[in-house]
Amino acid sequence: YIYIGSVVVLSYVLFLSWNEEKEIKQEFAEASFIEQNKSEELLPPGETVGFVQIQNEKLDVLISPSSGKVWQARLKEHTYLNNDESQGVRVFGFDLLSGFKFYLNSGFVSEGDGFDVVGVTPSSISLISLDGKISKTISLKEGDYELIIQDSWVGEVPADTPTPYVAMYRTDGRALDARDNFFENSSYTGVAFNTPDEPYANTRLRNIDERVEYFQRGGWVAFIQKYFMAAIITPSDRAQTLIALPPSNGSDTYVMGAISRETKVSEIMSGVEHRVFLGPKVRSDLISRAPDLELTIDMGWFWFLAQPLMMLLSMINVLVGNWGVSIILLTFLVKLLLWPISAKGFSSMAKMRTAGPKLKEIQERYKDDRAKLGTEMMALYKKEGINPAGGCFPLLLQMPVFIAFFFCLRESVELRHESFFFWIQDLSAPDPFFVLPVIFAALMYLTQQLNPQPPGMDPTQAQIMKFMPVMIAAIFIIMPAGLVLYSVANSAISLVQQKAMYKKYGASDLPGPGAN
């Protein structure tokens, strides 16, 4: 019943979750980012003609040398498909067929009208604006997921000090290279801000219908998708406005970024630096990059349980080197820690099962006198030391652990494309041959045979309960194999524990509800 409740709740959550830039001509107070009218040749993915390519061990980036825009960023170590031939997942990118685009630009408000290339290295590009006023360098940190942009003013700075900005531009729609399935689309996709008053404030693009802005020092603005994200990380001492803007002037593009304020002339001349993270949402890595950046990993309602569970899972994986085995070992450890609670529930059910024949006799004797039936049943419970709710409440306390495990495994990029054994080659994807859901259904059926039938359950309800293993297995068909593996391990261990407790109370040889 605990699984039924948990799976139904989580299925409901999943159901709910499923259900251009023109150069800036306004003054700072009215600055807005609008789709640029200048035509730029957009090439199909995989083609680099017309773009400059820079790369390091983690990222492969395409930059337009004429505008300085970062048009594409691929993650080399995270492929779209689970094979060696597949290309890396795109964080930034475009799709000519659908019109989808997600890119980044930076510079000075109302300044810059095209660039020329000054120099190129394997991991960087240097540009100068056509009017010679702005110098731009875009580089990749060695062996890292960060893009570093440096915008500098060349020559004398005007009295009206130019305002630096950095922004991401995105049309609404499903993330590039995301698997199109129910479970994949259930994760949060949208904008997130880090502010002094709210460490993690998020909203979906379609909900942005007016200008959103936060005046502050430091912080970050990010666009989050399942497993990966793009985040603009600002210096803690820089005064700025974090913004999100809806489409305007006929554009279909949303904007999220940062506009610097109170920028010193010396800083503009030496170069305003922007950090942009483009990579996987690995908690330990995000913690080291910026305060509260790890909050972009959605650990759900029971995050205080999910976070330590993920830490334990990672520690176990370091020792055994297999995420599937790690899930089984962590499940065993959790069941061991929860044994005192489970034991109370199992002992109560064992006593109920032992008293089953007497209870059935009372029900037959007083079937026409419900008042007397209730009195005699309560007298039997008192005599045998049975608490009718004793078997449910301790197990109910374990539901938060199951839900925490659900979010932990759903959001963990560490499990993406990680194999277990044999047919399971991706723990983040559903079991391709439905073996684990079938095993779970069998274990759930065996567990039902052990559990005493609740008093007063009508025959129709009893028949529905018999088909519950099949219904839960059907739901598990679309769940990640890692989560189903946890459920199988949890059910198997619970079954062993329950049989041991029944043997202790002499209830093993008594007929269960299936025999009745």
Which positions does each model-derived feature cover?
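Short extracytoplasmic/periplasmic juxtamembrane "stem" segments immediately C-terminal to an N-terminal membrane anchor
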Residues: 28-50
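Helix-loop-helix
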Residues: 1-35, 63, 151-152, 166-185, ...
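Soluble non-transmembrane domains of integral membrane proteins
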Residues: 55-295
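Intrinsically disordered, low-complexity segments enriched in polar/charged residues with Gly/Pro
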Residues: 39-41, 48-49, 125-126, 248-250, ...
